Amino acid sequence: MERSGKRILRLHTADPVAFGFQPPESLLLDVHRSLADSPGYCHPQGLTPARRAIVQHYRSIGVPRVDIDNVYVGNGASELIFMATQAVLEDGDEVLVPLPSHPLWTGAITMAGGTPVPYQCDEQAGWQPDLVDLARKVTPRTKALLVINPNNPTGAVYDRTTLLGLAEAARRHRLVLFTDEVHDKILFDDAAHIPLATLAPDLLCFTFNGLSKAYRVGGFRAGWLLLTGPLRRTTPFAEALNALAALRGCPNVPAQHAIAPALGSSGGSAMALPGGRLAEQRDLAWQVLNDVGMRCVKPRGALYVFASHRRTEARIADDRRLALDLLRQEHILVAPGSDFGWPAPDRLRLVTLASSDTLTDAVIRTSRFLEEYQQ
């Protein structure tokens, strides 16, 4: 379509740079100055200065027992998610995943031979995990529990009580914790992010983060994994991760020089404050969606809205076809709810990074399209 001259509004993926958000100039300068030192391979787990900066960061926010030997830098958090699931899971193992959940995780779990088992998140409670439903989903095959906080696609930020409940569920059933915290600096209103590892020092916890969202350098592919917990439990998984890290050679060296300066800055947190661009566009997207009847919970973090269009559900059987038809007719690209495991064809995820005028136009056009649409 673009080759034929059509302009596509891409509201399906959260690349801040594509919407005019620029990374901190000081971060780019640090990387540029380090290029002459970057042509060679580095340690399979990453550069020591980058890993030291990660250790210092997590110690400063209260994560106990942070050891540089259990820090892994990767080509984005995505690579490390695949490595971790390969290291932890055996064929037939089950992983409890939030519903809705990011497809990267369900894909990585499946590729590692595991089975994603969704636990419900309660829309009426701001998409907080339903701990009762989670308890029902535990079986003898359950190996791990995935927490995505702030959540993609819902924008939920989990409160302390919920996180303590999740940690207790993992403790009771001796589960490995996977915690995806890549949006931890993009918070709105009075939302506060609590690292799950601070509440579960006695549990084996894999914490994932990176520079793509808050620091607007997704193309750098710079992410990290922190492994915490009792030494007797971390050792076998660290050995597996070490082997996988060695197999890939090493992570991208130039981008690692961005990690230390990034962790010493505020990232995208200022833009998420009231009056900041991220906050204004979150407010606008939520307001316009509700004004046109596409109900959604107001996100408290991250870069997305997970909107309902239930008034048209009776006329829709396939939400992926809906998304494709919206693209063909209106040239608006969004992600259907089924991409996130949502069972009904009544949800769309939109990225809130576009300008205010563009977001308003996109939501109004999508609403008009849905009024007449049927399959």
Where are these regions (language model features)?
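Conserved PLP-anchoring active-site segment centered on the Schiff-base-forming lysine
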Residues: A87-I109
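Conserved glycine-rich beta-strand-loop-beta hairpin in the small C-terminal domain of fold type I
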Residues: A260, G276-W286, C296-R310, A344
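Helix C-cap/helix->beta junction micro-motif
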Residues: S4, A112, R172-H173, L203, ...
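N-terminal small-domain helix-loop-helix segment of the aminotransferase-like
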Residues: M1-G76, M83, D133, A262-S265, ...
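A short helix-loop-beta submotif of the ANL/AMP-binding
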Residues: M111-V117
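Conserved core segment of the aminotransferase class I/II
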Residues: P201-G276, W286-L289, L370-E371
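Active-site phosphate-binding strand-loop segment of PLP-dependent enzymes
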Residues: V117, D122-H193
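PLP-dependent enzyme catalytic core of the Aspartate aminotransferase-like
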Residues: S60, R315-D318, D325-V334, F340-Q375
